[in-house]
Amino acid sequence: MLYIGVDLGTSAVKLLLMDEKGGIKKIVSKEYDLYFPHPGWSEQKPEDWYSQSMEGIKELISECDKSQVAGISFGGQMHGLVVLDENDDVIRPAILWNDGRTQKETDYLNNKIGKDKLSEYTANIAFAGFTAPKILWMRENEPDNFNKIKKIMLPKDYLAYKLSGTFCTDYSDASGMLLLDVKNKCWSKQMMEICGVSEEQLPKLFESYEVVGTLKEDIAEELGLSKEVKIIAGAGDNAAAAVGTGTVGDGMCNISLGTSGTIFISSKTFGVDSNNALHSFDHADGYYHLMGCMLSAASCNKWWMDEILKTKEYSKEQEGITKLGENHVFYLPYLMGERSPHNDPKARATFIGMSMDTTREEMTQAVLEGVAFGLRDSLEVARSLGIKIERTKICGGGAKSPLWKKIIANVMNLKVDVIESEEGPGYGGAMLAAVGCGEYDSVQEAADQLVKVVDTVEPDAKLVAKYEAKYQQFREIYPALKGVFQKFD
């Protein structure tokens, strides 16, 4: 049988066709526009997502036996606000995860309602990207549009609705709305009241691997597929990507070294730290996960190489780095402020510890180590909750550097596994479709059978000890400079 994974991203929808053994048969990508109607705003037209997804599916299955397509599922950009009226028409363009218009509403939630209350209701605090502040913004700034709202949904769920007619979402994606009681897996009555919405306006909740419906007859006819093709709920992009890397089960970890950096830790038990330093969300395997987000990860190295050293020879610049764990230079990786664990938009990147004999290689090494130390900050929060973590998967552009992987393995004292294929949320979506269609009994079984580890970087005991001492020094730098950062414009 064949399964389709739909990765609804910010710049394009990426569609993946997978067979029952996990083999990738074809990948198609279709772009759409991103709109910035005012400084700091970021919007897209849900109709564009749908039209491009339909075109993408047609191209994806153009050369296969269409009778073999059994299911479709999703991994999608999180937090975006999609609103429909009583006629199922889109009321206004979707307000996306990276839209910054809701700082006033975010401050209201965190300071007036209070972070403790928000954590009690949802296991999280408010961020400008989350969905609930967007709803409050609509109520205040577009009351006519707000009063038209019949359905509130997330980006990938708009596709599921168009394909199946089922008004649905999954727990992992709903966790990022600030409307879900993450621990008890239900909509929070308190948050609905705060936002002025009813449960009837919110989608029905499903596990990521559950079937929400089948293709509508007219859609099936247009695509040339059976109307028995199952639509599976899918997951938010980070949870779907975690499925695609096999990060399911207790204490499993994945580090993504992209422009931003994430550390994703799956757990069979619910946990939330007292400072809400990590996001506490439901996971696509039916359990939970913690996630730390660094706003600048591989982008730190790109900035250092491109803007300061004026070179594209990234690998060559790392060749002279040999004295791991002995660097006297430290780098705080806060080029865009920081999310986890400090939640400080005013934090700034900093070099400290240079002297007259500091070399180019030591500065480059400090950048790589600073990102690793920043990831370790989030790891320590998870460990403080009693989660035992011994190894991690790694993906993203920065993971192509052997040196960076070695540094991370020793800074974090984790075995670092490199996987065979890295296709992110689309592959995770296809895996969820296979589980939903009964190809596998569980997400865990699918991950165990389909995700292949091709290399492991082992930590070295001597280097681990050296980096432990360096990390303890690193931890003292941000608190010492926090007050200074607050004075910067």
Tell what function each PLM region has.
Residues I4-G5, Q103, N110-I125, P133-T166, ...:
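Active-site core segments that coordinate phosphate-bearing ligands/cofactors
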Residues M1-R92, E120, K148, A220-E221, ...:
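N-terminal glycine/serine-rich phosphate-binding loop of ATP-dependent small-molecule kinases
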Residues K58-W97, I125-T131, A160-D181, K204-E207, ...:
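Short beta-strand-loop/turn "lid" adjacent to the catalytic site in phosphate-handling enzymes
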Residues L15, L81-L84, P93, I265-S266, ...:
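Short glycine-/acidic-enriched loop or helix-start segments at secondary-structure transitions
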Residues D33-E43, K117-L118, C168-S175, S198-Q201, ...:
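Gly-rich Lys/Arg/Thr-decorated short loops/hinges at beta-loop-alpha junctions or inter-strand turns
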Residues G22, K45, I72, D99, ...:
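Residue-level signal for inorganic ion chemistry
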Residues L8, E20, P46, E86, ...:
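Generic detector of well-ordered alpha-helical packing
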